[in-house]
Amino acid sequence: MSGVSVSLHDPAGVLAAIESSDRFLVQQVFKPIGNEYRISVPSPGSTEEGRALLYVKQKKLAIKEDIRFRPASDDGPHLFMIKSKTVFEFRGRHEVLDADGQVIGQLEKDFGRSLLRSHWRVRDAAGTELFEAYEANWLVALLRRFADLVSDWLAALTWLPFNFLLVRSGEQVGTYRRVLGKLRDRYVLELGPGFEGVDRRLVIAFAVALDALQDR
């Protein structure tokens, strides 16, 4: 992992490595039921995985969303998690909790704006908006929705680029893009200087939510 030295299973080391990074790779792992991911810091300019920092598992058949981020691939203690506030979360709001169960932020899908172009908001524990994210290309967003509504032969359109712009105070401060040509979903998240002071746990939780919860 470029420029990052961390014990594979040391929670403090993993969190420190996350907070010092501005570029992350999210790799979906094939599982017959449920979503799993690996989070790593790729080398500059690369879209290949670095050494895994976090292993992410979405709880199977859960009544409420339960997605945990762990420093090891087993089912040991988690460092943080995404959890729905209610059994049926119609508002698209999900809390991000630390290892002690304290709320550190909130992810919210704006369903009104997402009808034509997916739109998310990320807030801190006090409810203050930290940044918003929306699909980079409105035409691609419309084509993807059209493909979902018509016959199967247009299903290939769902493989169009799935890219988001991250905006803070009206300024673009990051990007999130799918790496094409991979069997399993792979995304690269890049953060600019405008992300200083934003808890990286919230940013990583958002990146995973875009794949795991996008269609909820």
Task: Show the residue positions of the predicted features.
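Intrinsically disordered, low-complexity proline/glycine-rich segments
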Residues: 2-216
